[in-house]
Amino acid sequence: MEHVVDVEFGGKMVTISTGKMAKQANGAVVVKSGDTMVLVTAVAQKEAKEGQDFFPLTVNYTEKAYAGGKIPGSFFRREARPSDPETLTCRLIDRPIRPLFPENFLNDTQIIATVVSADKDHDPRILSMLGASAALEVSDIPFQGPIAGVKVGRVDGRLICNPTADELELSDMEIVVAASRDAIIMVEGEARFVSEDDMLDAIFFGHAAVQPVLEAQEKLKQLAGVAKRDVPPPVVDQALLARVRELASERMSAAVKIKSKQERHNQIDLITAETTASLAAEFEGNEKQIRAFLGDLEYECVRADVLNSGVRIDGRDTVTIRPIATEAGLLPRTHGSALFTRGETQALVVTTLGTSSDEQRMDSLYGEYRKRFLLHYNFPPFSVGETSFRLGPGRREIGHGMLAERALSAILPKHDDFPYTIRIVSETLESNGSSSMAAVCGGCMSLMDAGVPISAPVAGIAMGLIKEGEKVAILSDILGDEDHLGDMDFKVAGSSDGITALQMDIKIGGVTREIMQKALAQAREGRLHILGKMAETLGAPRPEMSSFAPRITTIWVKTDKIRDVIGTGGKNIRNITETTGVTVDIEDTGRINIASTSKEACDLAIQMIRGLTDEAEEGKLYMGIVKKIMDFGAFVEILPGTDGLVHISELDTKRVKTVTEVLNEGDRVLVKCIGVDKNGKVKLSRKEALGLNPDGTPATDAPAGE
């Protein structure tokens, strides 16, 4: 039986229905707003796999080409591997729901969101976030929801819930907020130098906006009437737990205070191995349980130290930033490079400048578009002292790269002012927390090293949270272990003027406004400190670009002259590029970008293009070639494809009986344009050019009339 709930969400109607499609899934809903429809299903295995010790949640999001009335452009004409935007949406759905499953629920669980119809003004990503929660709510899968996501924009100081594409063009922020009844669960987005207070207002504007949608999910859950599965509480062997604590408590408390990541992990591994060996005979077959108890013990020791004494793993207090070292211009053949080191986290970041032909073509439900700024984040296994099989970037690398890309996009010059394609690659060389923020800091420095005229330097910092009851500690510049053992990972990037990007994930039920306000204020202090350290090495863009970077010169031609530049079958443009070695990009507007590392080659290409597109100007001198002799005058080619008539009366100051007395076909002759009629016919005069050089100066060595 189908159940339907309608709700107004940000001024637009949203319909959530269940019981009509995909009825063999544990939970399935169709979410519709405007002409956008998303089918979201939730399925969990009946039992957890034997020995399972983590929650295997998988989220898939697919935009079907037919949803936009298109046929896929791939060779096989069907949807292939997920695009980067689809991968990012998978993460967007996953992150807010993951902390809301019971801790001891370890069954394989899969959420699949399929966009089956799409229009431009109703974002399927937001509807998919809503659908994932709703599908879990109407299923028998245990879930501590509901939650919902909302996109928030701001135009002329007015906050907008789920803005349209046109509104986003004018907005100075685009953030996605996921929230429950009482708290914020996830935030991510970008902005143009928005203050901490304004960002906080936008986040909680989003929190208020999702409340009607949460009520609608609860109503749909009641209509569906599906009982939740029982999740038996975990069985704890109290005798084993007591023995583990007896043997390892003091040693673990000391181990978590070791500052070096590798030494600390080695000591914890040693404690684990020795404790397991000591208890092997007494508690045979319980090795996995012993390791779990030791993990809990590490968790408790780290958190207790921070909450009770304010001392962190590496001895810092809650606000201190790790030591920072920066270097710029260390790779001689690249266009821009920087090495950013913060504690045991290090990133080598490189900027490369290209032309519009290097832009990335992106295909979406709404058509093709091009990206001129790309940031790719790499996380090789050696950065954490491990080995693994590498097959392209994973979801985490794509997500971290996009966060850093958003952080830096706000400071880039406009395309008209700087017509380059920009690619930044961040190679994580060492990682002990905040590697994505190292990509932001190093990326900014590499842009400046490349001579990109950015509007302001940008830095990023990762904030953490440890919360037990009423005790709260907010941590600046968190370590990897503080991320793993803490309750929040809150990344904030921006300039001294405001925030350009942020991303927050939590592992608890949510965070309050007070916690977020303090975290944002503390993040600003840390960000300003990092910007100061970066400025000690490089505080502004270099005045000159690398000699290895292409120089792009922009010229304009009339749109009806574009075909003349290209030529039949591309003949002219091919001749220009082969002759000069430059790269030429022609836009439909008549804008032509010429890229070359050689000024001479660029000047020659401009001359050749001008020769193809210039039009005769009255009063201007031209050195032309006689193409045809007639009784009444001579036709002279003054520009490629442009002839003009020199009437017999304009050949000389004295009377000329026949044209051939003065000119013959193939002669080079200096002429002056004396007019262009309404039909484009050019009138030339040799007579008025006599006694002049081609540049218009008097030719003293040639008497008039010769």
Curated annotation (Swiss-Prot):
Residue intervals of the KH domain: 550-609
Pfam families the record matches: KH_1, PNPase, RNase_PH, RNase_PH_C, S1
Enzyme class: transferase
Binding site for Mg(2+): 483, 489
SMART domains: KH, S1
Catalytic reactions of this protein: RNA(n+1) + phosphate = RNA(n) + a ribonucleoside 5'-diphosphate
GO cellular component: cytosol
Domain of life the protein comes from: Bacteria
Keywords: Cytoplasm, Magnesium, Metal-binding, Nucleotidyltransferase, RNA-binding, Transferase
GO molecular function: 3'-5'-RNA exonuclease activity; magnesium ion binding; polyribonucleotide nucleotidyltransferase activity; RNA binding
The protein's role, per its UniProt record: Involved in mRNA degradation. Catalyzes the phosphorolysis of single-stranded polyribonucleotides processively in the 3'- to 5'-direction.
Assigned protein family: Belongs to the polyribonucleotide nucleotidyltransferase family.
Name listed for the protein in its UniProt record: Polyribonucleotide nucleotidyltransferase
Organism lineage string: Bacteria, Pseudomonadati, Thermodesulfobacteriota, Desulfuromonadia, Desulfuromonadales
Gene: pnp
